[in-house]
UniProtKB/Swiss-Prot annotation:
It comes from Rotavirus C (strain RVC/Pig/United States/Cowden/1980). This is Non-structural protein 1. The keyword RNA-binding applies. InterPro entries: Rotavirus_NSP1. Residues 80-170 are annotated as: Important for cytoskeleton localization.
Amino acid sequence: MANSYREMLYWFGKTIDRNLPYVNTNGWRKQKGRKDGICLNCLDECKLYSCDHCGIKHKCGNCVLSECFLDVKNEFNKYRWLVFDEEPDQAVLLQHWIMYKDYFLQKFNYRLATQAKILNMNKNQKFQLNEGRKRALSVPITSQFLKFRLFGKIYIQFGTIMTNKIQPWLELSTLKIGYLQLLNVERCSELMATRGQFTTNVAKTACITEIKCRRPIYDNDCIIEAYLDKNDRGWKFAAILGRRKIPVTQKLAMEYFMKSLRAELFYYAHSRCHTLSNCPRWNEGLRLLNSSTLNIVFRRQFMNEIVEWFEIFSQYTGSHYEFITECVHDKSAITAFKQEIEDYIKEGKQITLKSVVPEEHAAYRHILRLRESLMLAIDAALSRIRSQSMGVL
């Protein structure tokens, strides 16, 4: 069975416009042979074939006639495939994603006769639609994107990536999967599903920020479900572990917040270690990155600003060191840094960063901005935790 994004493309082309986005609309051919990556047109894991336009293997057997991402002409692909000369910021990406989302919902309209069947859950509990169409109709409009550098340009592709096999022809250090927001709340608000038997509101994401290490990436790293509660008549969010739905309370959220902070401190401390060093960050047996689903849900819900802060902080401090192959973890400095953060959370004591950025450090000129931005990021996370009046994320 194809993933929901590919099924969406199939029904998009079959019921709306056969040239949009120009894939095989006579039924998907059954994939045979070894799967070695994802097709950049349908984003499904499959055996890849060479593109007639560029010669790169980036198309599956069902999409051999589709456009090449290096030569975009049709309207749909212009919205979902972007190219930039320089690294785009989040504001630019958000503007493009809004245009992509608006165009998608205008064309793949859930109010049309075919799509509307999914909304009539109360009158049609048996829901007699074939599985492929159900998957197509349930595709989430996530703000997930695939980003890579090729021929000196930055390529952004919006879509739902649900596999750990990305592209064999790309250097992994140039590849990133990112998110502009967590859930497709706008579309969820239109759905009238009152029972969880058909999970139209599931956003399944591999939760990868950047692939630079040897950590195995698991297909089911993160599953998040938004659902309407019949009793409270409001939205609730839960992490899915097997068949269990796990709501996250305020108390647990605070525990995960402290745990996540400690993890960020750990990875900052080892941010300049080489993959071949004896640093525990690269030790397969430790598997610190193989976090629980609940931890990943929390990280995405509350930790975005703090994670971004540590990424920038690592760049500021790491860019002023020679590239080395030894572990540079400084236990005393990180312990002092950790204590500063805990004192700020518990007592409101200002963070100085003196333990990790001494005055002679080249990054010290950014010290005021770094201090203020870290405290603001922590404040934002704490305010979200304390505002959970429903008791769940």
